[in-house]
């Protein structure tokens, strides 16, 4: 996932002025019943530690990926809504879901605080109802896994 915007659109093909090309992404993503985007919350320079208490964001990346409007729409949230697709956006810090009302924050990682580690690094405010905690076993240090 290169960028996601406040509407749930995703850009995977045109990042920072570089044309990458979507390949077969369009055919697969637009025709699937459920689409799960996975990627980091931000890019370039983030430093994240896995501790027994969960994630510790020592430094956020320099390039935000949750933006007001994507540079190019490779995945259309409006089309997904019209076709009844279920859409999830998974990052190490949070999980978002596309709803009829917009992008909703549905899960956060252990150790992450919404006001400290998520909202200041997003260009929009997602719908926040009752986000649950991600499964803590997902964040075990590699030597313990």
Regions found by a protein language model. Give the residues of each.
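Conserved phosphate- and dinucleotide-binding cores of soluble alpha/beta proteins
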Residues: 1-144
């Amino acid at each position: 996932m290169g960028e996601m915007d406040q509407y749930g659109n995703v850009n995977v093909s045109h990042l920072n002025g570089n044309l990458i090309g979507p390949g077969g992404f369009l055919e697969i993503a637009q025709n699937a019943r459920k689409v799960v985007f996975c990627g980091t919350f931000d890019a370039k320079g983030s430093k994240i530690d896995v501790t027994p208490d969960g994630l510790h964001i020592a430094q956020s990346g320099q390039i935000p990926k949750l933006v007001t409007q994507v540079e190019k729409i490779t995945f259309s949230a409006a089309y997904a809504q019209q076709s009844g697709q279920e859409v999830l956006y998974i990052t190490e810090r949070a999980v978002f879901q596309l709803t009829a009302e917009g992008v909703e924050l549905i899960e956060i990682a252990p150790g992450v605080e919404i006001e400290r580690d998520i909202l200041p690094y997003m260009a929009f405010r997602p719908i926040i109802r009752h986000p649950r905690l991600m499964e803590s076993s997902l964040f075990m240090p590699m030597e313990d896994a």
